[in-house]
């Protein structure tokens, strides 16, 4: 087999083999464009078709999910599990329930997950799954029957040393509980095969808070290394769900002034900044009433920008926590005119063009595989607690989480340059790649 001699020939070959998968191709392009100079300096990583194997999932499982709705009608959905790479441990990654779910998105997420999990320093491989099922507006009975029907096929592909899923968009603690319960019934085994579980049956403290907390821990380390900090900074947060809420909570502890949140309907702007009391009000609307940001704005008498994202609001720090590709080149051109740092709380919320614009402008930029890895890290800590049949106090989990995020930041600096300004994209990509690649080379051609 002839191996590609340039990044463009490698990516062209990948595109021929994966047509009509834009999200996946974007993710691979972003990683390998930054990796290629490092690979050229280290030719050992071109041996054994390592790169070609690295971009091909080890296994893709696709199946139908047939279930009965509240009216007695049979519904059919499509579901997937992409078991991407197990070189350093069992496949690990969430199950996403959303109408947009397709193979391209799940391959992109599984690919990213492989490197993100490697960065945590915990023994976890990369995987991702999901279904085009939409839980919005559906009764608890419908959601339960769907989750149970899905598990009648998925259960045979899971195990504590094989594949350990978790929640994701549209798949929270309730859905994880339904799936974990059905898994236990089908397998007659109570071993840990899901993370993100409820505290009453093996969940970990700090898990709901982890991604948001970790995003702030990493961003603060990045700021501190460059002589900055959160105190007094104007912060734009996109999204208003779990990640956004706990990002705001931790940023407030560091005396930041968070002035935006958003959802698919538009953006709220609060120039006075969030407080603990305001955040509790937002959480009550979003988590208990399942309301919208517009409802919060109306009840508070605040500015609401219908149909707009937060990026037109002047800020010092931008933390995109909503969804992929929400921050494009046009938004980057606006926001970079004063922003000092951007850190990804969602998975790939910044387009390649926007990322390049930030880096060209000298803006500190933290990619999601590093900055939002804390959710995964805490999932790994949940697996460790389950394996030992113990539960740790919240303080212990939080301390471990802070250490893990500090280690990730250190690895990014080590590989991204220890000079005046670290290139965190290169650092994160190279650090994750090296760990996975070394494991694959050591294990032979598989």
From Swiss-Prot:
NCBIfam families: PRK09414.1 (NF006929). GO terms for cellular component: cytoplasm; cytosol. Substrate binds at residues 92, 113, 116, 167, 379. The record marks 168 as: Important for catalysis. Catalyzes the reversible oxidative deamination of glutamate to a-ketoglutarate and ammonia. It catalyses: L-glutamate + NADP(+) + H2O = 2-oxoglutarate + NH4(+) + NADPH + H(+). This is NADP-specific glutamate dehydrogenase. SMART domains: ELFV_dehydrog. InterPro entries: Aminoacid_DH-like_N_sf (IPR046346), Glu/Leu/Phe/Val/Trp_DH (IPR006095), Glu/Leu/Phe/Val/Trp_DH_C (IPR006096), Glu/Leu/Phe/Val/Trp_DH_dimer (IPR006097), Glu/Leu/Phe/Val_DH_AS (IPR033524), Glu_DH (IPR014362), Glu_Leu_Phe_Val_DH (IPR050724), NAD(P)-bd_dom_sf (IPR036291). NADP(+) binds at residues 211, 242. The active site is at residue 128. Keywords: NADP, Oxidoreductase. Homohexamer. It comes from Unknown prokaryotic organism. Transmembrane segments: none annotated. GO terms for biological process: glutamate biosynthetic process. Its EC number is 1.4.1.4. Pfam families: ELFV_dehydrog, ELFV_dehydrog_N. Belongs to the Glu/Leu/Phe/Val dehydrogenases family. It is an enzyme of class 1 (oxidoreductase). GO terms for molecular function: glutamate dehydrogenase (NADP+) activity. The gene is gdhA. SUPFAM superfamilies: Aminoacid dehydrogenase-like, N-terminal domain, NAD(P)-binding Rossmann-fold domains. CDD domains: NAD_bind_2_Glu_DH.
